[in-house]
Structure formats: structure tokens, C-alpha cells
Amino acid sequence: MDLTTWAIFPLLLGSIGVYSLYKLLQRLRSGAYLQDAVVVITGATSGLGRECAKVFYAAGTRLVLCGRSEEGLKNLVQELSQMRIKSAQLHKPHMVIFDLSDVEAVNSAANEILHLTGRVDILINNAGISYRGTILDTKVSVDRMVMDTNYFGPVALTKALIPSMIKNRRGHIVVISSVQGKISIPFRSAYSASKHATQAFFDCLRAEMSPYEIDVTVVNPGYIKTNLSLNAVTGDGSNYGVMDNNTAEGRTPEEVAQTVLRAVGERRKELLVAGLVPTLAVYLRTLAPTIFFSFMAARAKKERKLKDS
């Protein structure tokens, strides 16, 4: 080795050491931040919500699991109770059953949550519904239904719980949005509109909550291998019932749940959890919108031909 190499080598080792120490301290802070925190998760009975329940339970949080199915929530609580984890003190989860699209039910649910736990430290707005259809064939009632579940529901629950967070000078609001909160793709109009609205609301909320030391994290995943597309609604409100190829090849909910856990522990403001192509599309939409629009027009034409064939 020459003298230059010998000079760089200690600097490289030192940099690696400092970075490793930083990551270790970050993990320790994350663990302390999550231990015994009251965490509310909506849409907890399936998919990403279910996996989030597992990883946050394992982290020693006090869970409040929310969903429409009492049976589904009971099955999840039983599954959690059978987990064997030695690294954290575990707490039996609470269950709150309600329909997120019913604003009156949301307000009652928020009161029930606060009655059960006394406070909410972390709210994870996860519940949602997907959509497939053409704009021309989609009833306005379907647009409203998707907006009620994906936008107005999380907004109502967040607004109902924020006052208690402000009172305690502690809180963290998380929303599981989508890459489609950043870009719009053909035949997803109602879904993408709801996620764009979600992105905008929680971006505003982040700024307005900063004086109260309340964190806001927006997670924008790409395709996740769940039943979201199977349970999607179509333009007339019927069930789509098809597992899209992109969804089938997406990230596992376990992987995304771990990413959400880290994002919360690190108190990230925003996180894009997507592959190379969707990530590039997000930047292309901003930096070269004309090219992006051309790609989307070509995609719409291709998908329309496939449906007509």
C-alpha cells in the first residue's frame, strides 16, 4: 500500500465505527420510544395491519386493535398471545370494533379507545379499500365510498384523538398512504384521489402539529402482497375479485411492517417503500411531467386493449 492508502484506511474504519455507533444508538432510542407506548392500529385483522400488530406487539407496545370483524380481531389477539418473545415486556391487546367509513362510529370508537387506555401515543391509520375501474363507468357513490374509508375515516379518527395528544404533549400519527398518493395511474382514479387527499392532509397536519411536539409519518408503499386488489371495488360497487400480477409480485406485508416499525421508531416524516420503477416514476412526475403523462397514456392504452381482447 502507498502512503495515501494508509492514510485513507484509518479514516474509513473510523467512519464505519461512527456509523455503526449511530445505528446502535438509534435502535436503543427506538426501543425506548416504543416500549409501553399505546399504539392504535386500524384495519388490524388482515394484510399489513395484521403484520403491524405483530411487530408492534413484539416491541412491547400496548396495542388497541381496530377493525370491523369481532371474530377477526379475536383471532388476532389469540395469535399474538401465542407468540414467544423474551426481549420485551408484553401487554394484552385491547379490541375496538367499528366501521371507519362511518364518521359517527369513529367518534364513539375514539372515546372508547381513550376510556380503555387513558391516552394514545401512536395512531397508525392503516385501514383502506382499493378500487379498479374506468372513470366513465364509475358511479359517484363509489368515489364517495372510497373517499369515506381512505380519507374521511382516518381524518375523523385523527381529529378525535389529537386533543388528547396535545394535552399530553406527546403523540405520533402514522398514515399508510400509497405511491398513488404521489402519482396517479390509469383505472385507479377513486383510489389515487383518496390517497392524494390523504397525502395533502397529513402534510398540513405535520406542520400544524410541530409546535405541540407531535410527529406525523406518511408511509407510501408500492405493491404489497395482500388481498387488497381481491377486495377492491369496481365502478358499480361490486367486488373486483382478481389478484393483480403486480400485487402478487409485491413486497410481503411482513417486510413492510418491519419498515413501518423502524420509521416510527426513527420518527421519520415520510417514507417511500417501493421498487425502482415506481420510485423513478415519482421523480419523473415532478422533474419531467410531460414524459410521465406520455407513459401513463401508453399504459392506459395497453390496459384497455388487454381488457377488450
Curated annotation (Swiss-Prot):
UniProt keyword terms in alphabetical order: Endoplasmic reticulum, Membrane, NAD, NADP, Oxidoreductase, Signal-anchor, Transmembrane, Transmembrane helix
EC class: oxidoreductase
Topological domains, Cytoplasmic: 1-4
Transcription found in the keyword field: no
Positions of the catalytic residues: 191
Subcellular location(s) of the protein: Endoplasmic reticulum membrane
SMART domains: PKS_KR
Lumenal side stretches: 26-272
Matches recorded under CDD domains: 11beta-HSD1_like_SDR_c (cd05332)
UniProt name for this protein: Dehydrogenase/reductase SDR family member 7B
Protein's organism: Xenopus tropicalis (Western clawed frog)
Gene designation: dhrs7b
